[in-house]
């Protein structure tokens, strides 16, 4: 080969390298675009239930629905049950409404599988309840409906009966 001339092989390797780098760069931009418009884990489902009644049949339906989603999606679903108003009694140690023990046990079981139970702080104040009055898996939020709104703004699907 003469000095100053580039071989066909060198030219081919250079073009191949440029093509690979351009393809990699484009694919990274496409991936970045995809993740910018989705949650960190785009396959995860997010549900927030509003639990605002103490009726045992109603509580049964909500807990059954949450359990079915857990069975179907396992780790691919994040569930929050926002308890406010009379619904708060489900997660109270000494509920003021007649709540069947089996429903509290079911709520406890769901909590062990990752279902979060948020207790409305305003409702707690109106009942004269403190943190010690709740079952251990419950998390207090200042305003229950505000918590539900914020979860919706984070992409949670709102479910209410």
Predicted regions and their residues:
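Short N-terminal alpha-helical targeting/association segments
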Residues: 3, 20-21, 42
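Bacterial N-terminal signal peptides that target proteins for export
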Residues: 3-15
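Secreted/extracellular ectodomain signature
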Residues: 30-161
């Amino acid at each position: 080969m003469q000095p100053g001339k580039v071989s066909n092989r060198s030219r081919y390797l250079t073009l191949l390298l440029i093509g690979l780098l351009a393809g990699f760069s484009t694919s990274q931009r496409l991936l970045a675009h995809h993740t910018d418009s989705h949650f960190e884990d785009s396959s995860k489902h997010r549900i927030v239930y509003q639990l605002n009644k103490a009726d045992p049949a109603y509580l049964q339906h909500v807990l059954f629905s949450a359990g079915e989603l857990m069975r179907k999606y396992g780790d691919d679903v994040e569930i929050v049950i926002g308890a406010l108003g009379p619904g708060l009694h489900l997660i109270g140690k000494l509920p003021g409404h007649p709540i069947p023990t089996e429903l509290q046990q079911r709520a406890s079981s769901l909590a062990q599988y990752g279902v979060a139970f948020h207790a409305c702080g305003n409702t707690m104040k109106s009942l004269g309840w403190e943190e010690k009055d709740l079952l251990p898996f419950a998390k207090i939020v200042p305003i229950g409906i505000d918590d539900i709104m914020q979860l919706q703004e984070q992409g949670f699907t709102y479910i209410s009966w």
